[in-house]
Amino acid sequence: MITIFWIWGICLSVCCCLWLILGLRRRRMGEPPLEKGWIPYLGCALQFGANPLDFLRANQRKYGHVFTCKLMGKYVHFITNSLSYHKVLCHGKYFDWKKFHFTTSAKAFGHRSIDPRDGNTTENINNTFNKTLQGDALISLTDAMMENLQLTLRRPEPKSRAWVTEGMYSFCYRVMFEAGYLTLFGRELTRQDAQRAFILNSLEDFKQFDKVFPALVAGLPIHIFMTAHNAREKLAEGLKHDNLRTRDHISELIRLRMFLNDTLSTFDAMEKAKTHLAILWASQANTIPATFWSLFHMMRSSEALKAATEEVNKALEDADQQINFEGKPIHLNQTQLNDMPVLDSIIKESLRLSSASLNIRTAKEDFTLHLEDGSYNIRKDDIIALYPQLMHLDPEIYPDPMTFKYDRYLDENRKTKTTFYSKGLKLKYYYMPFGSGATICPGRLFAIQEIKQFLILMLSYFELEFVDSHVKCPPLDQSRAGLGILPPLNDIEFKYKFKHL
């Protein structure tokens, strides 16, 4: 018996050795330098996950602007020269940008693939987004968000001039989640108290689910996180079509998705709901921390606060809008919102400092990638990745890059600045918190408008102060690097009280 175990042990050891010898990838002629790491399958994943920016900078110094890293069994080619970003996008015919995103969505939210090539639906989700997040549809969505933000902030509760102290991130989370949920998925006009309780419960479920999202993207099954799994199922239950049909003022995006799910897909009721949950997550997970950073940096800079207040007051005066809790809600149209370069610059600068997105494309076939730094052979199923935080924090492009400068995106005429340089050359891509090319976030225009609306209302309705007048900027939560806007590692206490009572 012992002999048999020895034989099986030797066979297993030989198989492992053969796998290590034959399965290890070797760099071929014309390919980028290869950093495989020392842990089978994981490769460099632990080092990358601990601090992506430091990891990529170290490899950039070691290998140059283009190098390959093994991450979770995948070979990822990082392009770190911002002057080459537009060259990468010119190779679009060789990329499958949908594969990674559709696979990740199905894995994280628990529905079958929404890629039409997999046969579960014939809906082109990108066309759906383009129809409902631009043009007239964007106008109605933005108007609804302004109304719902004020519904949330101007809640008909006893008001006083007393200061209210709260964590700023918690405040932004609560307000933006509630207003955003109502904007996308509608309201129950006859059950306000029940709706409020439902939203608050959904908020807690969303936090539990979102907490494990980086692990789900990394490939871990949600069933090992029972609390998060239960939270996901409860969120999806509230987004079933039977429940949505009882609500009024559902956004055009969700109405169209409901129709297409019902007519073009083979999804069951729960799977349809989970495709809506994916939209809920996409609309909140980055917007909430982006809102926090915009409010935090605006308040922390006296110059930014003064310039923003003057711009908001002028916009309201020009639009003949009165600030009054008992009067009509504030309304600014799309043109008026777009003509606020100071707020635009504050938001852009806040996102520049907090964005850590990973722009990913999968190679459909073997091809040669031609860049400013040379040409490189890429294998089928390899991943091309851009990490714009390298560019956003490059001192040559953005002098003193770790300092918030509210007017960084304003030119000498106080209009939006669009000209930035690297190595004396004008950059085509200099600001990329929303991705790029075919993978650019379809909801980016709405996201900017809702953050801007939030700032307008906070400046209009409230007096704002930090509890600690010498508050320091909280560190970024690196556990979410690669997913978009990084939240603060700790909350910051602030206080607010109503004006004009």
UniProtKB/Swiss-Prot annotation:
Any one Gene Ontology biological process term?
Answer: cholesterol homeostasis
Subcellular location as annotated: Endoplasmic reticulum membrane; Microsome membrane
Task: Cite the InterPro entries for this sequence.
Answer: Cholesterol_7a_monooxygenase, CYP450_sterol_14alpha_dmase, Cyt_P450, Cyt_P450_CS, Cyt_P450_CYP7A1-type, Cyt_P450_E_grp-IV, Cyt_P450_sf
Q: List the disulfide bonds.
A: none
Q: State which pathway it belongs to.
A: Lipid metabolism; bile acid biosynthesis; Steroid metabolism; cholesterol degradation
- Report the catalytic activity: cholesterol + reduced [NADPH--hemoprotein reductase] + O2 = 7alpha-hydroxycholesterol + oxidized [NADPH--hemoprotein reductase] + H2O + H(+); 4beta-hydroxycholesterol + reduced [NADPH--hemoprotein reductase] + O2 = 4beta,7alpha-dihydroxycholesterol + oxidized [NADPH--hemoprotein reductase] + H2O + H(+); lathosterol + reduced [NADPH--hemoprotein reductase] + O2 = 7alpha,8alpha-epoxy-5alpha-cholestan-3beta-ol + oxidized [NADPH--hemoprotein reductase] + H2O + H(+); lathosterol + reduced [NADPH--hemoprotein reductase] + O2 = 5alpha-cholestan-7-oxo-3beta-ol + oxidized [NADPH--hemoprotein reductase] + H2O + H(+)
> Gene encoding it?
CYP7A1
Expressed in which tissues:
Detected in liver.
Q: Which UniProt keywords apply?
A: Cholesterol metabolism, Endoplasmic reticulum, Heme, Iron, Lipid metabolism, Membrane, Metal-binding, Microsome, Monooxygenase, Oxidoreductase, Steroid metabolism, Sterol metabolism, Transmembrane, Transmembrane helix
EC number(s) per entry: 1.14.14.26, 1.14.14.23
Q: Which Pfam families match?
A: p450
Note whether Iron occurs among the keywords: yes
Which metal ions or organic cofactors does this protein require, according to UniProt? heme
Q: What is this protein called?
A: Cytochrome P450 7A1
Which family is it part of?
Belongs to the cytochrome P450 family.
Membrane-protein topology? Single-pass membrane protein
Q: Name one GO cellular component term.
A: intracellular membrane-bounded organelle
Alphabetically, the GO molecular function entries are: 24S-hydroxycholesterol 7-alpha-hydroxylase activity; cholesterol 7-alpha-monooxygenase activity; heme binding; iron ion binding
The record, for PROSITE patterns, names: CYTOCHROME_P450
Gene3D superfamilies cross-referenced by the UniProt entry: Cytochrome P450 (1.10.630.10)
Query: Function, please?
Result: A cytochrome P450 monooxygenase involved in the metabolism of endogenous cholesterol and its oxygenated derivatives (oxysterols). Mechanistically, uses molecular oxygen inserting one oxygen atom into a substrate, and reducing the second into a water molecule, with two electrons provided by NADPH via cytochrome P450 reductase (CPR; NADPH-ferrihemoprotein reductase). Functions as a critical regulatory enzyme of bile acid biosynthesis and cholesterol homeostasis.
Q: Which residues bind heme?
A: C441
